């Protein structure tokens, strides 16, 4: 039942976060991982797994929060184009740190544990009740913020208004809460946050972001549900969700 719950949460959180990023930057290549959040989650998970100083979920959240704080400060000082460039470079740097941590794994068991998280699956191995409650709170806050700012983002995307840098930074923080609710538990699932929002914009020509929230959430949940059922009922073992999306 918890696995199905996180299929639903991931199917909503990642596409909605992707739609928000595309509207915030007015760019169809906008993605929840474009500012290095995915790389930061992987670095935090790797550090937590290899050191044992906290749970994998908490480590992932803390590192993603630090990354968001850095992006928050940068957002206050640069324009959109410069921020995207910074995000790509910053994400590459964080990813390199994660690689260094992983290649120095103390033993094979820890390396396997990290890999299974990084490959993304809904088995929720090693996830505690506290992790679940924490992620549900993040999801509720992030989704509420997405709905609250829907009209403002639509006007911003249409060029009717221009958000201040502070407003953009606060939106980034809200998107981080939404995305981390999924990534910290299930691992990074990249295709859902980029491909699904673009498919939604092909299907629906309206610029009302609320319609794309609905369409993207339905498509994302449906796609992840199919891949989860394939992984559960076909003897593939633990199969990465990001790969299952293409396999299915």
Predicted regions mapped to residue ranges:
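Alpha-helical transmembrane segments in inner-membrane proteins
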Residues: 1-248
């Amino acid at each position: 039942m918890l696995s199905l719950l996180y299929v639903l949460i991931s199917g909503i959180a990642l596409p909605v976060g992707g739609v928000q990023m595309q509207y915030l930057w007015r760019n169809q290549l906008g993605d929840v991982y474009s500012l290095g959040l995915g790389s930061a989650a992987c670095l935090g998970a790797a550090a937590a797994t290899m050191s044992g100083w906290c749970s994998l979920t908490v480590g992932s959240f803390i590192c993603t929060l630090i990354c968001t704080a850095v992006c928050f400060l940068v957002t206050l000082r640069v324009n959109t184009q410069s921020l995207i460039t910074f995000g790509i470079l910053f994400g590459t740097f964080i990813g390199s740190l994660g690689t260094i941590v992983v290649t120095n794994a103390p033993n094979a068991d820890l390396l396997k544990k990290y890999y299974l998280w990084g490959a993304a699956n809904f088995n929720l191995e090693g996830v505690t009740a506290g992790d679940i409650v924490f992620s549900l709170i993040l999801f509720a806050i992030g989704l509420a913020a997405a709905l609250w700012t829907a009209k403002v983002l639509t006007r911003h995307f249409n060029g009717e208004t221009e958000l201040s840098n502070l407003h953009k930074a606060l939106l980034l923080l809200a998107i981080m809460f939404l995305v981390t609710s999924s990534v910290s538990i299930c691992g990074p699932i990249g295709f859902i946050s980029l491909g699904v929002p673009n498919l939604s914009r092909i299907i629906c020509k309206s610029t009302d972001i609320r319609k794309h929230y609905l369409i993207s959430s339905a498509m994302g949940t449906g796609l992840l549900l199919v891949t989860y059922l394939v992984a559960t009922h076909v003897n593939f073992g633990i199969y990465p969700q990001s790969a299952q999306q293409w396999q299915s």
